[in-house]
């Protein structure tokens, strides 16, 4: 659960994604918290160290706003690139924030939105493979499919992270806070 007693604006947190079987999938270091509320967390990272489950490490190439909500089974990464804004949306459990990190279960399916507005549903085969391997329940399947529809509605209607204003407001806030560090 995310709330005011957690990190404050300008604090840095780690983000950890897990798979359904409990194994660590990926870790992002140093995401700056821009806003927390009872239901959501907005953050930003730039040139952040990412560690894969197999130990490989890489650095992100561009600033990315992140959006997590405790009631939705997706999170949204807004990548701010020279050729425009693109989005990578993970179908995932609602995030949990503890002293160690913000954590969620990644359920394989992703929606990518390109700067021209084109949308692609990715990793359907991986979702089916992992669903069989780890026995995703019918309830989880139903929840995830419903959340794909919610996500597409947000995309099509420019809601929340998909609005131009959101990107401007939160990226500018990140730049302000970065100058104060």
UniProtKB/Swiss-Prot annotation:
Its EC number is 3.6.1.15, 3.6.1.6. It holds the Pfam family DUF402. One of its GO terms (molecular function) is ribonucleoside triphosphate phosphatase activity. Mg(2+) 1 binds at residues 90, 106, 110. Its cofactor is Mg(2+). Keywords: Hydrolase, Magnesium, Metal-binding. It comes from the Bacteria. SUPFAM superfamilies: FomD-like. The active site is at residue 26. It catalyses: a ribonucleoside 5'-triphosphate + H2O = a ribonucleoside 5'-diphosphate + phosphate + H(+); a ribonucleoside 5'-diphosphate + H2O = a ribonucleoside 5'-phosphate + phosphate + H(+). Mg(2+) 2 binds at residues 108, 110, 123, 126. Has nucleoside phosphatase activity towards nucleoside triphosphates and nucleoside diphosphates. PANTHER family: PTHR39159, UPF0374 PROTEIN YGAC. Belongs to the Ntdp family. This is Nucleoside triphosphate/diphosphate phosphatase. It comes from Ligilactobacillus salivarius (strain UCC118) (Lactobacillus salivarius).
């Amino acid at each position: 659960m995310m709330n005011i007693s957690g990190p404050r604006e300008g604090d840095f947190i780690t983000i950890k994604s897990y798979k359904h079987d409990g194994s660590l999938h990926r870790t992002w270091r140093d995401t700056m918290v821009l806003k927390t509320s009872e239901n959501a967390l907005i953050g930003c990272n730039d040139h952040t160290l990412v560690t894969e489950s197999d130990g490989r490490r890489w650095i992100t190439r561009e600033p990315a706003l992140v959006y997590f909500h405790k009631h939705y089974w997706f999170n949204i990464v807004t990548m701010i690139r020279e050729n425009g804004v693109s989005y990578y949306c993970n179908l995932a459990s609602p995030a949990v924030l503890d002293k160690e990190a913000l954590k969620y279960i990644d359920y394989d399916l992703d929606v990518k939105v390109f700067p021209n507005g084109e949308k692609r549903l990715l990793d359907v085969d991986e979702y089916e493979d992992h669903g069989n391997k780890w026995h995703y329940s019918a309830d989880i399947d139903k929840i995830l499919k419903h959340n794909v529809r919610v996500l597409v509605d947000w995309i099509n209607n420019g809601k929340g992270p998909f609005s131009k204003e959101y990107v401007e407001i939160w990226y500018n806030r990140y730049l302000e806070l970065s100058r104060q560090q």
